[in-house]
Amino acid sequence: MKEISCGRRTRVSFGKTQEPLPIPDLVEIQKISYRRFLEEGLLEVLKKFSPIYSQATRSDLKKSDRGFALEFVSTRIGEPVVDPLECKAKGLTYSVPIYATARLTDMKSGEMKEEEVFLGYIPYMTDRGTFIINGAERVVVNQIVVSPGLYFSSEYIDREEYGGYFLPSRGAWLEVILDPYDGVLYAGLDGKKVNLFLFLKTIGYEKDEDILSLYPTYLDADDEDSLLLHVGSILLEDIYDGDRKIAEKWDILTKDLAERILMIDDINQIKIVHPIAQNTFEKMLELVSSSGEEGEEEEEKTKIYGLNEVTVVDAYLEIFRRLRPEELPRINAAKRYLHDLFFNPERYDLSEVGRYKVNERLRNAYIRYLIEVEGEDPEEARKKVYNENSLVLKPLDIVLASRILFDYFERRYVNDFEIDSYELRNLIRIFKEEYLEKRKTASYDLRKLVSVFRRNYGVTSDLSVLAAIRYISNINKELPSIPFDTKDHLGNKRVRTVGELVQREFERLFARAQKAIQERLTLINSLSKVSIQSLINIKSIISTVNQFFAMNQLSQFMDQVNPLSELTHKRRVSAVGPGGLRRESKVFEARNVHYSQYGRLCPIETPEGANIGFITSLAIYTKIDEYGFLMTPYRKVVNGKVTDEVVYLRANEEEDFKIVPATTPVDEEGNIIPERVVARVGEDIRLVPREEVDFMDVSTKQPFSVSASLIPFLEHDDASRALMGSNMQRQAVPLLKAEAPFVGTGMEWEAAKNSGYVTLAEHDGIVKEVDAARIVVHRTDENGNLMYDDKGNPVVDEYRLLKFVRSNQDTMINQKPIVNEGDFVKKGDPIADGPATDMGELALGRNILVAFMPWEGYNYEDAILVSQELLEEDVFTSIHIEVYETQARETRLGPEEITADIPNVSKELLKNLDENGIIRVGAYVVSDYGVGSQAILVGKVTPKGEGDTTPEEKIIRSVFGERGRDVKDTSLRLPHGVEGRVIRVDVYDQNDIAELGAGVLKLVRVYVASRKTLDIGDKLAGRHGNKGVVSNILPKEDMPFLPDGTPVQMVLNPLGIPSRMNVGQILETHLGWLAKLTGKWFATPVFEGAKEDEILRPLYEERKKRGLHLGDDENNPNGKVVLRDGRTGEPFDNPVVVGYMYMLKLVHIAKEKIHARSTGPYSLIHQQPLGGKSHFGGQRLGEMEVWALEAYGAAHTLAEMLTIKSDDIKGRNEAYKAILKNMNIPEPGVPESFRVLIKELRGLALDVRLYDENGNEIDIDKY
């Protein structure tokens, strides 16, 4: 065990591994991304559309004839006008002005004019990585999407094909497909299959010789079977017997030639066109050429037929016919259509990351291309990389992709398709006997061969024939199988961070504004008379970008329940959203944990509902590279020795490396101790020699998110319970008295530090002044001497603390100093705690003395029995701040007035209002002052419509003036069920906030702080997914008590542990008690937690010292103790596990959920009461509740529930009148839902009529 510093506290850590890498800034990803957008991305977008010509529509014009050109040279970001706190208070957007230097050029004269123009205000990120939009703090969530690139997918196997596709950032997919049935290559254009060679002719490979040369294969000149099998193939080189040429390039390999080659010793291999490429070429001839080779089938060919017979024009027209069969094929239209589809930068964008991925995927194919096609030396070729940089597709991209398909065909064939094994064995035998040994084959014509087999041997599957041929032709080759690309691999996924998301939006909108700028350019006559600012009016763009922050699915109202929920929200990664997956998607693979997520995305933290697996969290050490790929760090291992060199790897880069966990035993010099160690290799776990290890994890916390790494003994918890634990920590309410956990993980300090709510010292210094709202530190230099400026004044840092600020979820944000005057502080030390922090550490809950035992059924179904002591000591008391708002508007009948002069209101309700009618700060307000009277927060009256005034009213008006006017009381009142203290009042008029809203004269906001103590029905939880509801609050003298008389504070159900498999809570309970007894604070890092014997033995010794060991076994300590019943003093039958567990109070507070409905709103169609507190709704009586009432025979109750209490409109009105007049309630009528049913049936053309018991027709509309 070692001591570690956590904030201003020291913990005893059970961690044994050395961590060479400090935990990075956990909000850095958000900050860096948005800073890059403002500094570079904005200019990138503007330059992408520069220059804008006034005559841009005519591409054939010379530059000098293009009129005027506008281009953007640079951008500048101004300073924020209003600070974040003022923006939140006034409901403004925290933003900065952006300027661009634009240059206008007269293309004819060359004259230029440069000017800095104002583009508008754009939201600015706060220091904590958030945005303030219209006064609300928001976060833009990172989005994970499939990266643009080239993918060879197993999905094609379902269609019995091999294929890959180019996935662009913008534009159509281009597929490359190999159909193994007819051995032909196809290009998939716009969803239609076209012969690949036809397509290659349209993109630069005009001659057939050029195309066929791209697809060579080599035959072993000594392999008789292989040579004879490929009779009919096209030669790609001259063949010599000594000095005598016996065959030319482009000749056909005949049977005689093959036999002759076998007898020549000097020839090692011959180069031919790959059979599939030859087949594709012949298919192309059949498609386009009208003439054929009828009658020549039996004659052996010696020369290639139809070379260059298909022209480029033929290719264009044939493709256009395929793609647009409804249009008349024209060569210009065909060229334009194909060019726009894949080669026009305005329509097709592979993006930089897409180009990088394509280059990476084609690297090996390019090396083979250089060796086989270009004839380069293999050693030299392997040094080269495929370094294309075009953002549209290039012909060679498509060629290399199609060549890769041959590898899939040759190496995977038998495995990928279901072939009858008996039939296959039989075929191989026949093939060897009948064709190879008797030399019957004349050419590699798959179609003929298949038809012969079908006719002669009754073969049912074409694939069996092809598999047999493939088996024979590769009988001596050991070819490893090639894996397919998977979309779920993180090497094929990238993260769009906030900067990129905003930049994409900006780019999309600027494309629209470009036309407006162009139109204004056409109106210019001379440079001297024009202002560039008048040309550029892109305020609509800026306002729409602002709308992105307010409305986009990825811009979310920040989860601000506690510092952890805020930190997690900023590190969230979503697969849903624009351009991502849909929440309704049934693709389970996309939700599953993938091995490539190790160290990049947390395998634990994800929501439980429809978003499970789609929304995840970044792991602690994750970084995002310039392309958006997730990287994780590893320590380099050389010859079995672990070095301190840290390397960041992408998911696809680590595939072939052997990586061992951080817990692998090493000696003091870093040498791995065991000779064989467990290592990860791709998705496998293997036992490998230590010399073969390449990397080691940097930390045991590496795979997990911040939230998951805060769970002690995580390794002892089932994954689904750990998921609940990490999610529920984010719902913990900051308590009045924060207390850090006795048993932590060491991450509490890191989480609090990165949340932005713990104030850190910016420089070394000595604390000069401290009060509740500010801290002043006198700086010191590196020698500890106080610093003064040139005038002899002390150099000080002043820190302003947040006091009683309302969070997005109505919890309280409050900072308090944790240093005293005269304290020395170092740079980075915590000097003030925020909400839910204690001495710089995250403190979401309280350490509670718990006992695991049943108690009178009060802990049935995970319910929790708590002691009155927790209420008396304010252990789970929290403060919630709610804001109430009202506006005084200009109405048709005159202005509304905020006043204390409210008609027909008692003095009791007005006593806390000031002379302006606004509640005074510090007043304690209760929602109910007697029956039906709610506390008034803001007095407001609205003019009433006045009819003809009587003479008496005229006299009153003349005497009392406006006060005699008829007004309606529209005061802002405190809602039912709320009480608290007014802590702040904000009053704004149009002088304070320019955009107050049309017709709004004054805005008043009243902040009320409520104290919420623990109550029955409140939800409590531990950190291990162990959650429950308070069932009863017992006097502390009735609670079970320890041998020394200490009553336990909480009783939990022991049945909640075995089936849930979250044993971590038991270990935490034991270690928590040890911490309490010894006064130490422990840290048990993830996967390095304390072992049982490290806890139970010292715990027994400490308990024995204090006489608390009764019920435990000295030889085999179990941590149990004999408890006595507080009511009787009798001991319970069995010893009980007792200890300190860290418990959280969750934001689901019962008092906030309970409400009562009198008469409220009804839904429009069904006329049934709405549901939920926000709609003042009723309790739903569902189908099963109806069964229950039926089972009891409660006919009258049931009739009442289904009619007058629900949707019998006439009946409920009559019942209301009857109650008011103290009369009997009338008989119920017809429910509205019955009428809706009748209407629906009539809508289906069914004539529904109703009859009474006498057979008389009933008119339902009368009831």
UniProtKB/Swiss-Prot annotation:
Annotated coiled-coil positions are none
Q: Origin, by domain of life?
A: Bacteria
One MF term in the entry's GO annotations: DNA-directed RNA polymerase activity
Does the UniProt entry include the keyword Translocase? no
- One GO BP: DNA-templated transcription
Which Gene Ontology cellular component terms are annotated? DNA-directed RNA polymerase complex
Give the enzyme's main class according to its UniProt record, as a single word: transferase
Which Gene3D superfamilies would you find in this protein's record? Answer: 2.40.50.100, 3.90.1100.10, DNA-directed RNA polymerase, beta subunit, external 1 domain (2.30.150.10), DNA-directed RNA polymerase, subunit 2, domain 6 (2.40.270.10), RNA polymerase alpha subunit dimerisation domain (3.90.1800.10)
**Signal peptide span per the entry?**
none
Q: From which source organism is this entry?
A: Thermotoga petrophila (strain ATCC BAA-488 / DSM 13995 / JCM 10881 / RKU-1)
Q: What is its EC number?
A: 2.7.7.6
Q: Which reaction does it catalyse?
A: RNA(n) + a ribonucleoside 5'-triphosphate = RNA(n+1) + diphosphate
Keywords tagged on the record: DNA-directed RNA polymerase, Nucleotidyltransferase, Transcription, Transferase
Q: Does the keyword Transcription apply?
A: yes
What protein name does the entry list?
A: DNA-directed RNA polymerase subunit beta
Assembly and partners? The RNAP catalytic core consists of 2 alpha, 1 beta, 1 beta' and 1 omega subunit. When a sigma factor is associated with the core the holoenzyme is formed, which can initiate transcription.
* UniProt cross-references to NCBIfam families, sorted A to Z: PRK00405.1 (NF001616), rpoB (TIGR02013)
Functionally, this protein is described as follows:
DNA-dependent RNA polymerase catalyzes the transcription of DNA into RNA using the four ribonucleoside triphosphates as substrates.
Family per record: Belongs to the RNA polymerase beta chain family.
